[in-house]
């Protein structure tokens, strides 16, 4: 069974940091692009970060809204995806999801999702 389980969310003050984790199982982690997507309260899903697969040297890509503040990385030995979030802002408040990108296309083929972890940025 393919599983993605996020953790690490919580309440943090503006300017603070959090690291989210996404523990994966049931598939060959290195073969797949992995993505972070978020949903702010009352808003649509927003793609924020990608980690390409081993064939593409696990290179990364970010949305303009988080570039320079967030860092996506992998622990390939434990099949864990991370999202280091720095300089957090109120507008980063959201449910954060990791997703497997089956075809390596950020836009259409997210075939497995975790349940999400909630991040609240507030003083």
Curated annotation (Swiss-Prot):
Quick check: keyword tRNA processing in the entry?
A: no
Which cysteines are cross-linked by disulfides? none
Which part of the chain is the Ig-like domain?
Answer: 1-114
Protein keywords: Adaptive immunity, Hybridoma, Immunity, Immunoglobulin
Q: Which InterPro entries match?
A: Ig-like_dom, Ig-like_dom_sf, Ig-like_fold, Ig_sub, Ig_V-set, IgHV
Q: Which GO terms describe its cellular component?
A: extracellular region; immunoglobulin complex
Q: Which CDD domains match?
A: IgV_H (cd04981)
An example of a GO molecular function for this protein is:
antigen binding
SMART domains, per the entry: IG, IGv
- Pfam families to which the protein is assigned, alphabetical: V-set
Q: What GO biological process terms are annotated to this protein in UniProt?
A: immunoglobulin mediated immune response
- Gene3D superfamilies, sorted: Immunoglobulins
Q: Tell me more from the record.
A: This chain was isolated from a myeloma protein that binds phosphorylcholine.
Q: What is this protein called?
A: Ig heavy chain V region HPCG8
